[in-house]
From Swiss-Prot:
Region Disordered, annotated ranges: 235-298
Lipidated positions per record (S-diacylglycerol cysteine): C28
Polar residues: compositionally biased ranges: 235-254, 274-296
Localisation: Cell membrane
Membrane topology according to the record: Lipid-anchor
Pfam families per UniProt: DUF6856 (PF21637)
Keyword S-adenosyl-L-methionine: no
Name used for this protein in its record: Uncharacterized lipoprotein MG348
Keyword Metal-binding: no
Lipidation (N-palmitoyl cysteine): C28
Keywords associated with the record: Cell membrane, Lipoprotein, Membrane, Palmitate, Signal
Range of residues in the leader sequence: 1-27
Compositional bias segments (type: Gly residues): 257-267
Amino acid sequence: MKRLFWNLKHKKAWLVLLLGTGMILSSCSNIDQSFFRELSVESVEKNTAYNQLPVNSTTFRNLVFGTRSYNDGNYVVVIATETDSSQINFLNGSTNQGTSSLSWGGTLGTTIRQVQNRYSTYPNGVKFLIWNDIAPGSVKWNPYARFPVVDRKNELASQEDKDNSNKLRRSDASAVRYREIVDFIQRTYGGNVANLINQSNVHAQTVGNDVTKAIVIAFRKDNLNKIRANFYGLDNSTNPNAPGSGQGDSTPPASSGEGGGSDGSSGGDSSSGNGQNTTPTSPQSSQPAVQRSQKSYGIKQHAVRVSVDFLNFLDSVYTPLN
């Protein structure tokens, strides 16, 4: 009898361990996948549909850390969702939802045309990569949108409303990926991106409310072979080194948080800026403090502006030679 209980106890322990491991793997599943699409001048001019853009082979983890394996470290990463009106405008120049086939008539496409031959000091110019959250169905809720908070003692509320109280509205693969992306960027760059989510609109009942902002990170390799990460909408006077630019080997941070999940995982490659696994153990503490721009980082003053402002931002990143 004792042996039977011993076996059951240890089988249960192994089951818990396996389940826990599965949870960790699923929470990081999207981070080591390759899903960003290359947006070129040719694609903009031909109005190539988003889902027809070529997928780049670099993993999301390495792109966010800053890697010289892609265009020698000189590239712009754009993360957006079709669920927020300001982000739709940034991409295609309108505020209409349901933009799975983007026209690239907004600030992003206009600026890509303008910089085609602008940065001649870079042999291959500056490359643009984009991933866009596309909500299934006709109702376009932001990946962070939640159901209203309902008191379970409220006799006027339906049981369905009580059951859904404060839960995330979306659990589709695109929403899960979007939340993992934002979570990973926040963990990697800490306070620099603390206000990506507008908490006051998370429970908004109007589809299209701006819950998150378009995330634009411009990476540049300087003359010391360090890759700098520059956030559009921030005061970039103190550009932090990207985690992949020569900060030594360390253990990757776990990406967790509500809304994480798995739609499959590839191992990805472990190389970042200096050809080694240079993920910081404590990404928030490894980055120097960056002062937020009062005029550009509030949710009401979107990171989406007229194209000349975005062009000025890119000029400030890629024109310096130091």
